[in-house]
Design a protein with these regions (language model features):
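A recurrent flexible, glycine/aromatic-enriched loop bordering the glycosyltransferase active site
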Residues: 97-98, 171-215, 219
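Non-catalytic membrane-proximal stalk/linker segments that position and tether the catalytic domains
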Residues: 1-31, 191-192, 265-310, 391-407
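A short, conserved alpha-helix in the catalytic core of glycosyltransferases
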Residues: 124-129, 195-221, 226-254
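Conserved donor NDP-sugar-binding/catalytic core segment of glycosyltransferases
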Residues: 119-176
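Glycine-rich, basic loop-to-helix element that forms the pyrophosphate-binding segment
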Residues: 90-107, 123-124
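A conserved acidic beta->alpha catalytic loop
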Residues: 67-76, 92
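Short, acidic, metal-binding catalytic loop of nucleotide-sugar glycosyltransferases
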Residues: 50-60
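Short aromatic/hydrophobic "clamp" motif used to bind/position activated sugar donors
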Residues: 112
Length: 407
């Protein structure tokens, strides 16, 4: 039977990726414990475990499946497989963090591989991830390139065979939560472009497919169990980063991700849990994230964010302001001049607000919560973070104060 255009497209992606595989050879393969959570995901499990062993290109692994009270025959199916599976049968739907932590406690492997049940592997994925881990220094995690599968429904069809995950970055949002994580290059059809087809350090990988040394996982306390299906992988990545471990994105470990198979089904409950996850994350990591993003922007590393420093100046233009704008632009910052004192809508992109007028109602601005507020004045004003009088070298003096105070 002839293959459909969609099957041919999928096969072309798989065949193309084969050309990039390292096919690592190991003197001794370390044991990898593959941890999978599932809840009524029989159809996902059948896809995941089709030719599972032959696709790994790696022989030394065990599988630990955490079943969260399935009633669709998942347990019976898992028990029928001729694979090294250990089954944890829960009587309730435990969180992603708790399920993985419970499995990690009984894992025999030197490495833990967190894997969603809605993943469809392609050849060589596990060999690639382990090889990447062993051939880089100070690695805390290795993530994979995840691709959306083909979707038949019109609403989702546009994202078919596009990138779902190629590392995580952050961007500004006009919410109290200050910054939002996103998958870089998401929905791109350029699956093998140079930007996403080389190993690189990222701030975070998704835990949909994540390799971690068990010792590091345990030393950092595993996944934080205060989350429920959201932000726990980013939280763990920040623990790695804070402890000077690298998170590496390996694009040659390529898998299809059919998305969100073991989450809460009630929409209102999902929204509530998502809100609680966000609030907990930013209460825990908000200050650290602000500092790291600010450093990233000033140094233009494009590691955590792709954005530049954004500065809004509340003032009419004059000789002093004109020079200040020029000096800040020379630092390759985005600078916007706002001459209207009644304009309070600063926007979510603004990092630094500079006011040349003490009558500006800075307490009522519409912006992110954590922007730095500067008043051009020789008098203190408690509404502002920095008060600095005019000088010929104002831009440099201001940035020195900001770097000393915040970085």
């Amino acid at each position: 039977m002839d293959k459909s255009p969609f099957e041919l497209r999928k096969q072309k992606i798989i065949d193309t990726n084969m050309n990039f595989l390292s096919n690592y050879e190991f003197d001794e393969e370390p044991l990898v414990s593959i941890i999978i959570l599932t809840r009524n995901g029989l159809h996902h499990l059948k896809r995941l475990f089709t030719d599972f062993d032959s696709k790994t290109n790696y022989s030394n692994y065990e599988i630990i499946v955490v079943d969260n009270a399935s009633n669709d025959g998942s347990v019976e199916y898992l028990k029928s497989l001729n694979l090294p599976i250990t089954l944890i049968e829960n009587k309730e739907n435990v969180s992603f963090s708790k399920g993985n932590n419970d499995a990690a406690k009984i894992a025999n492997g030197e490495y833990l591989l967190l894997l969603n049940n809605d993943i469809e592997p392609t050849y060589g994925w596990l060999n690639e991830m382990v090889g990447c881990m062993l051939n880089n220094d100070d690695v805390g995690s290795v993530g994979a390139k995840l691709i959306f599968p083909y979707y038949e429904d019109m609403q989702s069809q546009g994202k078919s065979f596009t990138i779902q995950h190629a590392g995580v970055k952050f961007r500004e949002e006009r919410t109290p939560y200050v910054y939002g994580p996103y998958h870089s290059n998401m929905f791109s059809t350029l699956i093998f472009s140079n930007e996403v087809n080389h190993q690189k350090e990222v701030i975070s990988n998704t835990a949909a497919c994540l390799l971690v040394p068990k010792e590091i996982y345990e030393n950092l306390g595993g996944l934080d169990e205060n989350y429920f299906y959201g932000y726990e992988d980013i939280d763990f990545a920040f623990k790695l980063h804070k402890n000077n471990y690298k998170s590496i994105f390996n694009p040659f470990a390529l898998l299809f991700h059919h998305e969100s198979a073991t989450r809460v089904e009630d929409e209102d409950e999902k929204n509530r849990l998502n809100y609680e996850n966000i609030m907990y994350f930013y209460n825990k990591w908000g200050d650290y994230l602000f500092k790291e993003i600010f450093i990233d922007k000033i140094n233009q590393n494009h590691f955590i964010t792709d954005k530049k420093i954004d500065i809004s100046i509340i003032s009419k233009n004059d000789e002093f302001i004109s020079k200040l704008v020029k000096d800040l632009n020379n630092r390759d910052f985005n600078v916007k001049l706002i001459p209207n004192l009644n304009n309070l809508a600063i926007g979510e992109d603004c990092d630094i607000l500079i006011s040349n007028n003490k009558d500006y109602d800075v307490d009522k601005i519409i912006s992110r919560l954590n922007i730095i507020k500067v008043l051009i004045s020789n008098e203190d004003d408690s509404r502002y973070d920095i008060c600095l009088e005019k000088s010929n070298d104002y831009a440099n003096e201001l940035m020195n104060i900001i770097e000393e105070k915040y970085l």
